[in-house]
Structures are given as C-alpha cells and as structure tokens.
Amino acid sequence: MLDHAAEMKSAAKAGRDGPKPLAGKSVAMIFEKPSTRTRVSFEVGISQLGGTPLMMSAQDMQIGRGESIEDTARVLSRYVDVITIRCFSHDMLLTLAEHATVPVVNALTERSHPCQIMADLQTMIERHGPLDGQIVTWIGDGNNVAASWIEAAARFNFQLRIACPEGYAPPAELTAWARAEGADLVMYDTASEAATGSQTLVTDVW
C-alpha cells in the first residue's frame, strides 16, 4: 500500500494522470468528531482518485435523531461505494462495519487512528528511506494515535520508543500483544531519553 501510494504521489507531482480507482464511485464521510486535517486529506484524496466525497455530520443524519447505526449502515450501503467514519466510539465503527455491505474505513476512533499513521510512515520513507532500522519516538499520552503507532511497530521493522506522563501509558495488553508480534518497543521515563538518536519524533498532549 505504501509503495503504491508513493508511486501515485510521484505521478501527481510530475503532472501525470494516475489511476482513478474511485472513478464513478461515491464515498460517504461520517464525521461525528470534527476535524480539519483528516477531513481535508480524505476529501482531496478521494477526489484525486476520481471519487465523489459526501461529507455527513451526525447532526445532518437520522443517526443524530435516534436511527440505529445498524440501519444507517444498511441504508448507506445502498447509496455509496465506501463509508469512512470518524467517531468517538470504536464499537460504533465495528457495528457499522458488521452491518454495511460496502468497505468501511476507520478515520479515527477513541482507540485508533490508522490512516494518520500510514501517512506518517510514508513521510518517514520519503525523508529517511526504508523503515527497517529506523527509530521513532512517541512523546505524549498513550492515546489512540499512540495505539496505532504500537500496532504499526508490530507490522513494520522499526523501533518505537514511548515516553508518556506517569499514569498515561498505553494499555498494557496492547504493548504485550505488540511485543508478542515481534515489535521492537521500548518504554522510557523521560522524553529526552526517548528522543536521543531518533530519526522521527511524534508529539501529542503531555
């Protein structure tokens, strides 16, 4: 996926027409939680791939007036080709995906933010080359974005260092899972220690 994204970005920068896998397709964007960067990047990306983004806030939908997420999933699946959702509850995402008959993309929940991490990984490759052996440091609360970094560390060959305020570490079961999957995960007590020698620093609330 990252290689394909790099090829498409390179073609766009060179002024060449890239593939349009979303040509003639509509993508619903349910944003229960407001956003600037996520919304703009999704809308622009969908348009560049030939699709039509349909922005939908909870206030604009029947879901804001009591319609179940199950019914919303079924109805939207009849109209659109893809559903993206940015919501407060991960369970809402899972329920939507279970009852939809079209692909569902996680644009953020309280547990994870995978699309942001994929974009960050692409930036790391552009700046520093292959991910193998790179060192990334997360400085901040062990929140949803940190969780997605931990999941990425279990899938790619880079070292992830984490420095969190006391009492705000990522869930122990998540870090245990990642290490069992082969993640090179190191916890630090201070941000300065964690940052030393890193190629990439990612910061959040402290």
Protein language model features and the residues they cover:
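Glycine-rich phosphate/diphosphate-binding loop of Rossmann-like nucleotide-binding domains
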Residues: E32-V44, R127-D204
